A protein has these predicted regions:
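A short, conserved alpha-helix in the catalytic core of glycosyltransferases
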Residues: 161, 167-186, 190-217
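Glycine-rich, basic loop-to-helix element that forms the pyrophosphate-binding segment
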Residues: 62-80
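Non-catalytic, C-terminal membrane-associated alpha-helical segments of glycosyltransferases
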Residues: 232-240, 252-305
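Short, flexible, basic/aromatic active-site loop/helix in glycosyltransferases
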Residues: 134-166
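A conserved acidic beta->alpha catalytic loop
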Residues: 23, 40-49, 65, 95
């Protein structure tokens, strides 16, 4: 009987995912029966060969193209044998036996549907590991890089030993029962971003609590897969925000958000075009925002696209 299925989506982060899996093996005790499922989104950095060589016991699903995080997670969950799922980013690192802590917590607290640990950076700064549901105001402040004015952000430094009931936790380390995942038909594959927020919101409507557990921690290097492809990252973030609002907010708020994102993308295209001769990163970001503008004009924010 498998207790936990750990599902990791990989895209060209060989140097991180190898360390991640090694840390899982090092810190997870023999008393917990687990399996590791890696869903590879057509990495070209030798990730699959490295994983097959170092960890022949793990399961690797090899996609012929990059199908995104959300669909890859669902793909891994479909073959998972564990009673629980631990959805884990490849750029995370175990520092202790977090597996037992999270597993035992859900076993003891059946009213809680999803739990996540504290995520820290390599210099031990506490990262934002949970959120409040986005409002129109908080979303506008976020997309215009005015988060310092945002009262809707979490209290990142909550560091008590007991758990904190929150709206949503980070999909970077997302622990839940497989039955709950199945009951909600997995992550919404219309969303390439904010899938964790959407899932938590749907779970809460069924009466499940969402918990942040600060007494166990993982290192999270943040966004190492997304940095590999700015075009996909930029468009997914902005279009998924619109899709989330279409799912959970009224039409007037949706139209306000779409207008604000249009303005943002046009301004970003203009100044990144000016800066692009000076840096390859600026050039990649310019292409990302230009691609996003084309997708907006084609209304690729509709649900089902």
């Amino acid at each position: 009987m498998i207790d936990i299925s750990i599902i990791i989506v990989n895209y060209n982060v060989k140097e991180y995912i190898v360390d991640c899996i090694q840390s899982i093996i090092r810190w997870t005790p023999e008393t917990i029966q687990y399996e590791i499922i890696v869903v590879d989104n057509n990495s070209q950095d030798g990730s699959v060969n490295a994983l097959e060589t170092k960890f022949p016991e793990i399961t690797i699903l090899k996609n012929k193209n990059n199908i995104g995080f959300t669909r890859a997670i669902n793909q891994g969950a479909n073959i998972a044998n564990g009673a629980y799922l631990f959805l884990l980013n490849p750029d995370t690192l175990f520092l202790e036996d977090s597996m037992t802590t999270l597993y035992s917590f859900l076993e003891r607290n059946r009213h809680v549907g999803i739990v996540g640990p504290k995520l820290i950076s390599t210099d031990e700064n506490i990262q934002q590991s949970y959120w409040k549901y986005p409002t129109l105001i908080s979303s506008l402040l976020s997309i215009y890089h005015l988060d310092f004015l945002n009262n809707n952000k979490n209290h990142a430094h909550y560091d008590k030993s007991n758990y904190l009931s929150v709206d949503a936790i980070s999909g970077g380390a997302f622990f839940l029962a497989k039955n709950l995942f199945n009951d909600l038909n997995g992550f919404n594959d219309n969303l390439f971003w904010m899938e964790d927020m959407d899932f938590c919101k749907r779970a809460s409507t069924l009466g499940h609590k969402i918990a942040y557990l600060p007494n166990t921690k993982l290192i999270h290097y943040i966004g190492k897969s997304s940095e590999k492809n700015w075009v996909v990252t930029i468009s997914n973030r902005l279009l998924s925000k619109i899709k989330y609002f279409k799912l959970h907010h009224g039409s007037s708020e949706v139209m306000t958000l779409i207008t604000a994102i249009y303005l943002l993308v046009v301004v970003k295209c203009a100044y990144l075009l000016f800066l692009s001769p000076f840096s390859s990163v600026y050039r990649k970001k310019f292409i990302g925002y230009l691609t996003t503008l084309k997708l907006l004009l084609n209304k690729q924010y509709q649900i089902g696209l």
